[in-house]
Amino acid sequence: MKLDYINEENKFNEDEFEELTEDEIYLNKGADAYQAGDYETAIRLYQKSADMENITALSNLGYCYYYGRSFPVDKTKAKECWEKAAIFGDIPSVYKLGDMYRYGDLPQNLDYSHALYKRAFLLALDNMDNYYVAPDAFLRMLKYYPEEISDFGYSPIDIAAHCVIGIKDRIARGDNYSGKVLSDAKAVLIKLLDE
């Protein structure tokens, strides 16, 4: 999937921005700054985009708060961002809330975490071509509830292979944060193939 606003060097084409809305321009420039490690600029641009009701920018702000990008870690603010974005079906926000309930960032609730992972998985099935979000949602179900994947008409092995391919694709496009996720996806695929 070639994004029309990214050129061969994985930099945003200024000429292509006229096809995007103002909030999308701020979002994409923020993502470019984030990948370059310029978190202050990324946060400023994400906030502008979120103020224009861009749900992805709101989700990305959640990551900045959760991981302490340019300010102290604030998991309460991360949760607030992700809850707002999850209402609109933002896949990363849904599974990150699931992580917070699974790993104890919020009062641990494995049943609710499971429900959130399942919701993210179902949303991702409708967005399988989006390698920036679908593999992460799939991976959580593969790690914790692989037996349920076939209930939706998919083979866990096929979903795991899709994850590996998708994560490799986004790394090739300049994603600097997916190395560990790729290792996890490969490990899950190998485990499934060995069963």
What are these regions (language model features)?
Residues D111-D126, L139, F152-A172:
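TPR/TPR-like (Sel1-like) alpha-helical repeat modules
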Residues N10-I25:
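TPR-adjacent "capping" and linker segments in tetratricopeptide-repeat scaffold/adaptor proteins
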Residues Y26-A33, N60-Y67, K96-Y103, F138-Y145, ...:
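Hydrophobic face of amphipathic alpha-helices that form TPR/SEL1-like repeat modules
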Residues T21-E22, M52-N54, Y67-R69, I87-D90, ...:
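Short helix-capping/linker turns of helical repeat alpha-solenoids
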Residues E22-T41, L45-K48:
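Alpha-helical segment of the N-proximal tetratricopeptide repeat
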